[in-house]
Every structure is written in C-alpha cells, then in structure tokens.
Amino acid sequence: MAKLFLDPKAPVVECTLVDYSAGGACLQLAKFIQLPDRIEVLYGTTRKRCRVVWRRGLRFGVVF
C-alpha cells in the first residue's frame, strides 16, 4: 500500500505499489482520478517527490 499526495489541499489517495526500483515505481489506483504531472508518494516510511511519466488505465509510472 502507498499514499499519494496530489495537492496540499486535496485528500490523500491510497493506491497499490506494484513495482519499485531505485529510479521509479509502478502504482495502481482503485478508481480513476486525474493525476497532476508531479506528486509525492509515501510507501512505508519513505516519501518521494515524483513525476508521472506514463499511465495505462488504473496503473501509472513515476520517476523519482
């Protein structure tokens, strides 16, 4: 499980961490939401600033 921080005023969005590497991650949403180009992802105790680089259905990829 991971959490997405899209905007300081927006609620936190939970998602599934599908795959992770040193340079990025693949995540999956439970339902479709509009993602901004830049987000923050929290998984475990690690919080990373990310850029969304691709999206296919409910899955999307980010680079750190």
Language model: regions and residue ranges:
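Structured alpha-helical
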Residues: 1-64
